[in-house]
Swiss-Prot record:
The gene is ligA. Keywords: DNA damage, DNA repair, DNA replication, Ligase, Magnesium, Manganese, Metal-binding, NAD, Zinc. It comes from the Bacteria. Residues 577-656 form the BRCT domain. DNA ligase that catalyzes the formation of phosphodiester linkages between 5'-phosphoryl and 3'-hydroxyl groups in double-stranded DNA using NAD as a coenzyme and as the energy source for the reaction. It is essential for DNA replication and repair of damaged DNA. Belongs to the NAD-dependent DNA ligase family. LigA subfamily. This is DNA ligase. Its EC number is 6.5.1.2. GO terms for biological process: DNA repair; DNA replication. InterPro entries: BRCT_dom (IPR001357), BRCT_dom_sf (IPR036420), DNA_ligase (IPR001679), DNA_ligase_AS (IPR018239), DNA_ligase_CS (IPR033136), DNAligase_adenylation (IPR013839), DNAligase_N (IPR013840), Hlx-hairpin-Hlx_DNA-bd_motif (IPR003583). It catalyses: NAD(+) + (deoxyribonucleotide)n-3'-hydroxyl + 5'-phospho-(deoxyribonucleotide)m = (deoxyribonucleotide)n+m + AMP + beta-nicotinamide D-nucleotide. One of its GO terms (molecular function) is DNA ligase (NAD+) activity. One of its GO terms (cellular component) is cytosol.
Length: 656
């Protein structure tokens, strides 16, 4: 019986310990009955003394608030995607790239399972869980703190007091997934397609009480912002697990490639027997000092890959082939399949890529084929079982005319294009893309509405969206006045949209969200007034990207200007740069320094320096730390100014 606050605190600590052993270590210390008894005693004390409730008490995991929607939440540091490798050759190619960048092969690999769930970012400050965010687009997610607190394997309090982002995957056991679907069937509710959908859907419930009923598990796999000082990723993760998080099986360190391949084989064998869904193995360079040297592409860190499991394959029949027309006019053949279940998902369609591929594989309607599905990759046909042919299979001819507008197509071999800019499919898909989440994000303007607007002659180009009137929309099927007003207001609200969203919405080939942000940071809204060679200066922009931008601007200059006049996009806020000896200079960092290189890089960039990854005659300074390598030698050879890290700090202090 709890008599006073001291008894209460002891009871809470005991409950925390029991919960940790049960949910994290899978090693219960007491019976469920004993746990429930103490839990209810703690609850009773808290009801009588609401002013003395410990916020980290297990009873506080579930709140009574039902949200109207989720607030957007900006991650303290970006949550990157991961490059996928699907076989030994792909993996060896990645290792080869790492060796080339580092200039040696003195590194090891940290290995861990790749869970097939929903990514979550936890932020702890002063040891308390202050926020939990979904991955979102990698920079901005949704605040799901109340739901995350209901997951028993997420500690509400940790011993690490510094600000830290702990990242991981929310998953559900396969058995629990089956039980959940059985329950939903009984209640007449739609079932979840697979455990990942169940985990993601449970995490995004507006009522935390529903999330609390779902047996979700959280496995950490990394960190974002942190002030930890570890030399190896494996040591860093050892520390994270010591904070009270659930540790996955089979993680470890490999010194060489044969060890990695052996681990991969072990994971493949573990795949079916493991309690939650795995879709591969994550391989990271263990030495943290090499992470900054390896750097990042526009999407991925170069120091890690997801070594995916072999795809699951099934046999089925091609019942038909339809041809889709994208916003760029490319005709893509898609196989309509006899429905087949692959890895818990019903597959009814598979990409055929292009008509050259159809001819190469001799694919016909009516063929028995092998279809594979791997992770998020669109299902595809890998083999035609020609020996099962009966003679009534139909060849698939190359189209000579667009299946949507009837215009003659341009056949370039692998690509067949409809060149009619007014083709309904091209126009509708352009509108859908323009309004999509990572572009203008116009609420209520999805595929069905875009088709309606086009079919009723209200929109022939994205610029027409801004001429829409409530009275015109009211005449459309299923458009009541309120819905019409909402759409018009949603479109009008995009005036003053961020520059990068505007550029991304233009749909320039090879230019996605990350590239759009770089264009806006460099040139702002008037990017279209700059010469092609100026785009070459942007880090990561290759010849194809530059050519694509130049061609788009040449053809669409008037349209860009009209949209700018309508939307008045906002340029990124320019940070006020304090004048330093490095302002406007090109700098290269090399060697091990007293602070993480990423920190020094950001500091220099905030001062207006351009921090490059390679040394050339245009480099102003090479700043070196301990064990400086080939960049130091190259700078010496080219006569580039060499500064030790101490010299850098001295120059900053003296301001010269």
């Amino acid at each position: 019986m709890i008599k006073d606050y001291n008894d209460y605190k002891k009871a809470v600590d005991t409950l925390k310990k029991w919960a940790y052993y049960y949910y994290v270590l899978d090693n219960p210390l007491v019976t469920d009955e004993e746990y429930d008894k103490l839990y209810h005693e703690v609850e009773e004390y808290e009801k009588k003394h609401p002013d003395k409730i410990d916020p980290t008490s297990p009873t506080q995991r579930v709140g009574d608030v039902v949200l109207e929607g989720f607030e957007k939440a900006k991650h303290l540091s970006r949550m990157w995607s991961m490059e996928d490798v699907f076989n030994e050759k792909d993996f060896l190619d990645w290792v080869g790239r790492v060796k080339r960048i580092l200039g040696h092969e003195n590194f090891s690999f940290y290995i861990e399972p790749k869970f097939d769930g929903a990514s979550l970012n936890l932020i702890y400050e002063n040891g308390k869980l202050i926020r939990a965010e979904t991955r979102g687009d990698g920079e901005i997610g949704e605040d799901v703190t109340l739901n995350a607190k209901t997951i028993n394997s997420i500690p509400l309090e940790i011993k690490e007091k510094s600000l830290i982002e702990i990242r991981g995957e929310v998953v559900i056991k396969k058995d629990d997934f089956d039980k959940l679907n059985e329950e939903r069937l009984k209640n007449g509710e739609p079932t979840f397609a697979n455990p990942r959908n169940a985990a993601a859907g449970s995490l995004r419930q507006l009522d935390p009480k529903i999330t609390a009923k779902r047996p979700l598990i959280f496995y950490p796999w990394g960190v974002g912002v942190n002030s930890l000082n570890y030399e190896r990723y494996s040591e860093l993760m050892d520390y994270i697990y010591s904070l009270g998080f659930k540790e996955p099986p089979k993680r470890g360190v490999c010194k060489d490639i044969p060890c990695v391949e052996k681990k991969y084989d072990e994971f493949v064998k573990l795949r079916d027997s493991f309690e939650v869904m795995l879709d591969g193995m994550v391989v990271k360079i263990d030495e943290i000092k090499y992470h900054d040297i390896l750097g990042y592409t526009q999407k991925y860190p170069r120091w890690m890959v997801a070594y995916k499991f072999p795809a699951i394959e099934k046999e089925t029949i091609i019942e038909d082939v339809i041809v889709q027309v994208g916003r760029t006019g490319v005709l893509t053949p898609v196989a309509v399949l006899k429905p087949v279940e692959i890895g818990g998902v019903i597959v009814e369609r598979a990409t055929l890529h292009n008509f050259d591929e159809i001819e190469r594989m001799d694919i016909r309607i009516g063929d028995h084929v092998i279809v594979i599905r791997s992770g998020d990759v669109i299902p595809k046909i890998t083999k035609v079982l020609t020996w099962k042919r009966k003679g009534d299979e139909k060849p698939i001819p190359r189209p000579t005319h667009c299946p949507v507008c009837g215009a003659e197509v341009l056949d370039e071999g692998a690509l067949i294009k409809c060149q009619n800019l007014s083709c309904p499919a091209r126009v509708v898909n352009t509108i859908i893309y323009f309004a999509s989440k990572n572009c203008l994000d116009i609420e209520g303007l999805g595929e069905s509405v875009a088709k309606l607007l086009y079919e009723h002659g209200l929109v022939k180009d994205v610029t027409d969206l801004f001429e829409l009137k409530v009275e015109d929309l009211e005449k459309l099927p299923l458009f009541a006045r309120k819905k019409a007003e909402n759409l018009v207001n949603a479109i009008k609200s995009k005036v003053g949209v961020e520059c990068w969203r505007f550029v991304n919405a233009l749909g320039i080939e090879h230019i996605g969200e990350v590239a759009s942000k770089k264009i806006c940071e460099k040139f702002g809204v008037e990017f279209y007034k700059h010469a092609p060679e100026e785009f070459e200066e942007i880090e990561g922009f290759g010849p194809e990207m530059v050519k694509s931008i130049a061609e788009y601007i040449r053809v669409n200059k008037e349209k860009i200007e009209k949209l700018i006049e309508i939307l008045k996009p906002k340029n990124p806020e320019k940070k006020e740069v304090q004048k330093t000896p490095f302002t406007g200079k090109t700098v290269v960092l090399t060697g091990t320094m007293s602070k993480p290189r990423s920190e020094i890089k950001k500091m220099l960039e905030d001062m207006g320096a351009k921090v490059s990854s390679s040394v050339s005659k245009k480099t102003d300074f090479v700043i070196y730390g301990e064990d400086a390598g080939s960049k130091y030698d190259k700078a010496k050879k080219l006569g580039v100014n060499l500064l030790s890290e101490d010299d850098m700090w001295k120059m900053l202090k003296e301001g010269k």
